[in-house]
Structures are given as structure tokens and as C-alpha cells.
């Protein structure tokens, strides 16, 4: 009876599994049919909630737990098209839900293709920044927790070896271009032949020059039969970029209001203010002091400016928590700052453009742009951190008088018209005296100020739009004074038209222009005298130790060990590269360029132009022949029939192989004997160690080794002798003392040394000490 009940339960379990698999199969078939029958023009109006989409129940369950119920415009238009397997280019406002627009199709496509953990990588999601990659991975983990996929996050700043050991088991991989490219080159287990979907979030940033090398490397490893999804707030129309991605008839998806204007949220209030360069920090300080109950995000153009503003404002204590976030930061610190700012109710974050794209900081009240963005697209992404998902938000852009006209014209083309804001003089407070005091007291703050000054001017110099960014019209001294610096630091910007002209000039003409009438080189007196600073004098100090010039000259190592003392030279070079009287003389001039001099000193470079060497051998008659000379046809026929020569050659080689085989067998036999001898030696040592300990060894405790050879008998243990002599070694006998006293030392009167073994008792030590004192 019990057995029948068990069989009944087992049968019910098997039946339930079959029914479950059958129901899942029927569900997937119905979803495929709904996706194939979907018509965007007809069915788009009927889709308002996630439950109306042709997606699985597990995905709906995860969305419901995360409180995702209604669809946004970009989600309503892009998800059904992506589910049909078509390439997609999605453009929508910032904060409109683009992350779910590509995560849901990724999960559903993998489910329809029956991807398991044993199928390897099936979906790759690329993000331009680490913070955005972390945010995408967190959303994926929440909505896909009821599915059986394995997902991984790979970004810079983490342990590469830890990721390599687990990356082969990932079905969905989220990461930054640099780390994904590194794993494709180095990780053995990262196989991309089964890849189904490639997603580029913030596609225009991923495809620009900053990530060109990494993206090209990633695309070279991926199969062409994949589905590609591109999402961004600002799209790219570059034919070259789209050709790199190998898109096949991509569908362009954009909300109705995004077709002709940029993706600025409607609930965002935009303002701009015209501020001189030397008053920017004063305006920023006054703004923060008047908005202590707000959540503020401040953008600078360089990380050095972020560090300087953070350190100085933190010292001045405005009354609101301050944070900083920029690229050259440890990954742990960046994540901590991101989490703290997301959870804070009132805070101020100084950041660079690293947080301008994709990051979702909840409830940001103000976005302040202290420095002008490089283009309108950067402006759109910056202000998009506020007014997300229909919330209210405000933005403020600080423009210099030289930047106002050009930037407003660029923004007007994209139908962006911020309102002008006037700042009352009584509400503006100057912090220049405090900054000067900080720079005077703390050298670290002063150094940060100098680096921030240089970084700002370099950022303006490298901008492409010269109608907006005019570096020549910037007030240098006034800006340095506003940072609290005693003077403007010297800015060294590499490149420029002067360097290009020097590079294109002929080296010989340049050298001839420096020669006088006699052809001798003259020094350039036009160069201004170099100003020697305190730091130059510190680094130019002569060493007074063994590295001093005097010591090196004494050891003849100051110039590579060569003896080139000027007093001993009787021939000196007066001039070079001058015309000789006799034109028929060979060219024996010194090399006029560094490249020629390097080639002359390099043996490898000298031999490169001489061709390959030839080797000859001489026969008995003294006729030379090439060492690898082929035999002629006539000589071959003289030797006899070809078949006969073949048989003779084979027979000769067989005899040689027999001799070689005998030698190999002998070597193998010697190796076996040596291995056996070592094994016996190990066995003998083990046995001796056990006997020395006095415990002995039972037969069952001995190692199971072969006993082909007779075991060597262990030497009997010698009785301890404390003081021996050369004569005692010849006797070979042991003396026993019944009184327990140590034996009397037997040594020659003229012996200078005392030989003894290790004492074991207190009496032995006393006897040894007495003997040593007597000697």
C-alpha cells in the first residue's frame, strides 16, 4: 500500500513537470504569434500597460514588483519592434525610460531562443560610463530575477582575474567599452559566436572618437547575424558610424515631439546668466548659500576644477553636504558618492561630464553649468539629470560675454531658448579674500588652484567651435586672482601652427641658416634667457656623493667609460658638412640627422640593406658550390635508376633508425633504473629516520614500493662520544663508563682544536665548559 502511494506521488510529479513544460511551450508559441501579427500603426494605440505587451509572465512579475505598470512613449514604440528581431535606433527625452526599452526585449529574445547558462554569452550591453553600467545592471537584476539567466557586470576599477574566472558562465553582460574589449582579447572563456543582441546605450557617445578603438575591437569579435539596438537622447546620422555597426534596415524610433526638437523635458525650467570669468565662483557660492534646502548638481569642464571647488568650498562650510565625482577616482569612491547623493535629500555634487549621461539621480532640483558645454548635445544631457519622469526641475547656465551670442545661436537652431536671469548685486557675495587666505596658508590648495587654472584654459583651447570659445579674449590675470592665486601660472600648450611650421621645414636648410660665412654653426642669440625658478635651482644642484661629476670623472664613467679628456686630444673638429675642393672624393661626412646617426651605429640597420648572406663550400677540385645546392638532372641520372635510388635511400634510413632505436631503448632503460634507484633511496631514508627516532616502523606503515633490489642494511647507530681525537677515529671502539661521568678527553698536547658531538645532559655541558676554559 505504501509502495503504491509513493509510485502515485512520483507519477504526479512527472506529470506536473510535463504539464509545466507543455504550458511554457504553448505560452511561447502564443507570444511568437502575437509578435508576428503586431502592426505598429494599428496596435500601438491599444498598448498602454506592460501587461498588454507580448512578454512572459516572469518578466511581468518582475516589472510589477518594481512598480513599472504604464508604458512611456519610447517604450510603447520600441519594445514591440525590438521583439520582432529588427535593428533599432531609439531617440527620446532624457528620463523617458530608455533603459527598460532595451532590457525587456533583451530578456524576451533570450527566452524565445531557449538560452541557458550553458549557451554562453547571448546579450551584450555597452555603456560609456561605469556609473551608468551599474545602474543598468541593477535594473536588470530587479526585473529579471524570476528568469534563470546569469548576468554579469564588468567595469574598470575591479579585479580582472575575478571576472575572467566567471565570465564564461554569463548570458547577459553589462560593461564599459574598455573592460569588455580587454576581456575579448584576454579571457579564454568569453565566447561570442552565440551572441543574439548587442545594445549600445548612449550610442552617440559610444561611437565617437573617445571609444573608437574599443568599439571597433568589440565589433570585430561579434557575429554579423546579431540584432543591434541603439538608444540615446541625441542620435547620430553619420553613415560611417552606422556602417561600422553593420545595421540591416534599422528602424528609427522617436517620440512625436522628438522628431524636430532636442530631447529637453517639458517640465524643465531653463535659465542662463551672463557672468564674467572672474566672478563665477562668487556667483556659485552665493547660489549655494541661498538654496541650502535643495539638491544641486554642478558641472565643471575638468576634474581639476572639481577638486579645487570641492576643497575650498568644504573649508568655507556653506551649510550643505558637498560631494565630488570625476573620472580619475577609485571605483569604490565613485560608487559611494553615487549612492550617497542618490539617497540625500539636500546635497550639492561637483562633477564633470562623467555623470552627464544616463544616470538617474532622484529629485534633483537644480543643474548648474559653471562652464559652457562643448555643444548643444552635451547641454541636453547635462540638464537631463533634472526633471526626470515628469518631475519639476530647473537648470542654470553660466555664460561669459564672449560665449553668449554663439551659444544662444546654436541652441536656437535646436529650438532651445533658455530665459535670461539677472543677479542682484546685494545677493552676490565675494569669497576672493577667503580663497587668497587659503592659498597662502595651504600649499596644497594653491597647487590645486594652479592646476584648475591651467585645466580650464586647456579645455577652452581644445574646443572645436572657435565662434563660442575664444581663448585669446579671456581675462587671465583677473581669473587667477579670483582663484586666490598671487599670479597667473604659465600655461604650456603643446602643438600649434608654429610647431607645424618647424616640423615641415627642411633640416638642412635650417642648419645652414644658423651657419656663418665660414660655414661654422653659431649660437642662437635671439632666444630669450630662461628664467630660473626656485625649483629649477633645486633640481640643478650638483650631487656631492659618489654620483658627483668629480667622482665619475675619476672612475672614467661619466661618459660611458671612454677616455675623452680634452687635454689629451690633439685633433679637434672645427667644422663639418662643408664643401670639399675635390668633388670626386667619396662622401665621408658625418650623419646630419639623428636617424642617419642611429642607423650608422646600429649593426642591424646597416646589414638590412646588404641582403642575405651566402655560404659556399669547396669540393676536392677547389670548385665553390652553394651549401644548399640542388643536384642537376644529368648528375641524378648518372647515379642510376630512380626506383633503385629510392630503395637504397629507404634501406639506408632504416638501418640508421635501427641504430637510433637501440640508443633510445638504452636511454629509456637507464631512466627506469634511475627512477627505481631514487625510489629505493627514498625508502631507505624513511627507514633510517624512523630508526633514529627509536620508534621503528611496522610493515604496514611502510610505503608500498617495489622491492626488486635487495634493501640496504642501515648502519648501526654510533654511541655518542663527546670528545674525540684523531686517534679515536682509528680505534673505532666505544668506551662505556659505569660511573655516569663523561669520558676523559683524549687529545694530543699540541692539539689546538677540540672535537665533540652534541651534549645531551647537564654533566655533558659542564664537562664541555671546563674543557673550553682550560684551553
Swiss-Prot record:
Name listed for the protein in its UniProt record: ATP-dependent RNA helicase DBP4
Biased composition (Acidic residues): 689-703, 723-732
Pfam families the UniProt entry points to: CTE_SPB4, DEAD, Helicase_C
Gene: DBP4
Primary location: nucleus
Function in brief: ATP-dependent RNA helicase required for ribosome biogenesis. Involved in the release of U14 snoRNA in pre-ribosomal complexes. Required for pre-rRNA cleavage at site A2.
InterPro entries for this protein: DEAD/DEAH_box_helicase_dom, Helicase_ATP-bd, Helicase_C-like, P-loop_NTPase, RNA-helicase_DEAD-box_CS, RNA_helicase_DEAD_Q_motif, SPB4-like_CTE
Keywords: ATP-binding, Helicase, Hydrolase, Nucleotide-binding, Nucleus, Ribosome biogenesis, RNA-binding, rRNA processing
GO CC annotation, single: nucleolus
Sequence positions that bind ATP: 92-99
Chain positions covered by the region annotation Disordered: 1-30, 633-760
Coiled-coil zones: none
Gene3D superfamilies: P-loop containing nucleotide triphosphate hydrolases
Subunit: Interacts with the U3 and U14 snoRNAs. Associates with pre-ribosomal complexes.
PANTHER family associated with the record: RNA HELICASE
Gene Ontology MF term list: ATP binding; ATP hydrolysis activity; identical protein binding; RNA binding; RNA helicase activity
Amino acid at each position: 500500500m505504501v509502495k503504491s502511494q509513493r509510485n502515485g506521488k512520483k507519477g504526479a510529479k512527472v506529470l506536473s513537470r510535463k504539464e509545466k513544460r507543455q504550458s511554457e511551450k504553448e505560452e511561447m508559441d502564443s507570444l511568437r504569434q502575437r509578435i508576428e501579427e503586431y502592426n505598429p500603426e494599428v496596435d500601438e494605440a491599444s498598448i498602454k500597460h506592460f501587461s498588454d505587451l507580448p512578454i512572459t509572465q516572469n518578466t511581468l512579475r518582475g516589472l510589477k514588483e518594481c512598480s513599472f505598470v504604464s508604458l512611456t512613449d519610447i517604450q510603447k514604440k520600441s519594445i514591440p519592434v525590438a521583439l520582432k528581431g529588427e535593428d533599432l535606433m531609439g531617440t527620446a527625452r532624457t528620463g523617458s525610460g530608455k533603459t527598460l526599452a532595451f532590457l525587456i526585449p533583451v530578456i524576451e529574445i533570450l527566452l524565445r531562443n531557449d538560452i541557458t547558462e550553458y549557451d554562453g554569452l547571448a546579450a551584450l550591453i555597452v555603456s560609456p560610463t561605469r556609473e551608468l553600467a551599474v545602474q543598468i545592471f541593477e535594473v536588470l537584476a530587479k526585473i529579471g530575477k524570476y528568469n534563470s539567466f546569469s548576468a554579469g557586470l564588468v567595469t574598470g576599477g575591479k579585479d580582472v582575474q575575478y571576472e575572467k574566472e566567471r565570465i564564461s558562465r554569463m548570458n547577459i553582460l553589462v560593461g564599459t567599452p574598455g573592460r569588455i574589449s580587454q576581456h575579448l582579447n584576454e579571457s579564454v572563456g568569453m565566447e561570442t559566436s552565440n551572441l543574439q543582441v548587442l545594445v549600445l546605450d548612449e550610442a552617440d557617445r559610444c561611437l565617437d572618437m573617445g571609444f573608437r578603438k574599443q568599439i571597433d575591437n568589440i565589433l570585430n569579435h561579434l557575429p554579423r547575424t546579431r540584432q543591434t539596438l541603439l538608444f540615446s537622447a541625441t542620435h547620430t546620422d553619420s553613415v560611417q558610424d552606422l556602417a561600422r555597426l553593420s545595421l540591416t534596415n534599422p528602424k528609427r524610433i522617436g517620440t512625436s515631439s522628438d522628431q524636430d526638437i532636442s530631447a529637453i523635458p517639458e517640465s524643465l525650467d531653463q535659465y542662463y546668466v551672463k557672468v564674467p570669468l572672474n566672478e563665477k565662483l562668487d556667483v556659485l557660492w552665493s547660489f549655494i548659500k541661498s538654496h541650502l534646502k535643495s539638491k544641486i548638481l554642478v558641472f565643471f569642464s575638468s576634474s581639476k576644477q572639481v577638486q579645487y571647488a570641492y576643497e575650498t568650498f568644504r573649508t568655507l562650510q556653506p551649510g550643505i553636504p558637498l560631494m565630488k565625482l570625476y573620472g580619475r577616482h577609485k571605483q569604490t569612491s565613485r560608487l559611494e558618492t553615487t549612492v550617497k547623493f542618490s539617497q540625500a535629500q539636500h546635497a550639492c555634487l561637483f562633477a564633470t561630464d562623467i555623470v552627464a549621461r544616463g544616470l538617474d539621480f532622484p529629485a534633483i532640483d537644480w543643474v548648474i553649468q559653471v562652464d559652457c558645454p562643448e555643444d548643444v548635445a552635451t547641454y541636453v544631457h547635462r540638464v537631463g539629470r533634472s526633471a526626470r519622469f515628469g518631475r519639476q526641475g530647473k537648470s542654470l547656465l553660466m555664460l561669459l560675454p564672449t560665449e553668449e551670442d554663439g551659444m544662444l545661436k546654436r541652441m536656437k537652431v535646436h529650438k532651445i531658448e533658455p530665459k535670461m536671469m539677472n543677479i542682484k548685486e546685494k545677493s552676490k557675495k565675494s569669497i576672493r579674500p577667503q580663497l587668497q587666505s587659503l592659498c597662502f596658508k595651504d600649499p596644497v590648495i594653491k597647487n590645486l588652484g594652479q592646476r584648475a587654472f591651467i585645466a580650464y584654459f586647456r579645455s577652452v583651447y581644445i574646443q572645436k567651435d572657435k565662434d563660442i570659445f575664444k581663448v585669446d579674449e579671456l581675462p587671465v590675470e583677473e581669473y587667477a586672482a579670483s582663484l586666490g592665486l598671487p599670479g597667473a601660472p604659465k600655461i604650456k600648450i603643446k602643438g600649434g601652427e608654429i610647431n607645424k611650421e618647424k616640423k615641415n621645414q627642411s633640416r638642412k636648410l635650417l642648419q645652414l641658416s644658423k651657419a656663418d660665412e665660414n660655414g661654422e654653426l653659431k649660437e642662437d642669440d635671439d632666444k630669450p634667457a630662461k628664467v630660473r625658478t626656485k625649483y629649477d635651482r633645486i633640481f640643478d644642484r650638483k650631487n656631492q656623493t659618489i654620483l658627483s661629476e668629480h667622482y665619475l670623472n675619476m672612475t672614467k664613467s661619466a661618459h660611458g667609460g671612454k677616455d675623452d679628456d680634452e687635454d689629451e686630444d690633439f685633433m679637434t673638429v672645427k667644422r663639418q658638412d662643408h664643401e670639399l675642393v675635390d668633388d670626386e672624393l667619396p662622401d665621408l661626412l658625418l650623419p646630419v640627422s639623428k636617424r642617419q646617426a642611429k642607423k650608422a651605429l646600429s649593426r642591424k640597420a646597416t646589414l638590412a640593406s646588404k641582403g642575405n648572406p651566402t655560404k659556399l663550400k669547396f669540393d676536392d677540385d677547389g670548385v665553390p658550390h652553394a651549401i644548399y645546392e640542388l643536384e642537376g638532372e644529368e648528375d641524378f641520372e648518372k647515379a642510376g635508376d630512380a626506383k633503385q635510388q629510392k630503395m637504397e635511400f629507404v634501406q639506408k634510413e632504416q638501418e640508421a633508425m635501427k641504430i637510433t632505436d637501440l640508443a633510445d631503448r638504452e636511454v629509456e632503460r637507464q631512466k627506469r633504473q634511475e627512477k627505481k634507484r631514487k625510489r629505493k633511496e627514498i625508502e631507505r631514508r624513511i627507514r633510517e629516520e624512523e630508526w633514529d627516532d627509536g620508534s621503528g616502523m611496522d610493515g604496514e606503515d611502510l610505503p608500498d614500493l617495489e622491492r626488486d633490489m635487495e634493501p640496504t642494511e642501515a648502519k648501526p647507530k654510533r654511541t655518542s662520544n663527546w670528545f674525540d681525537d684523531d686517534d679515536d677515529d682509528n680505534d673505532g671502539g666505544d668506551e662505556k663508563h659505569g660511573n655516569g661521568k663523561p669520558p676523559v678527553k683524549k687529545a694530543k698536547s699540541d692539539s689546538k682544536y677540540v672535537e665533540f658531538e652534541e651534549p645531551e645532559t647537564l654533566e655533558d655541558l659542564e664537562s664541555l665548559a671546563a674543557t673550553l676554559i682550560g684551553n
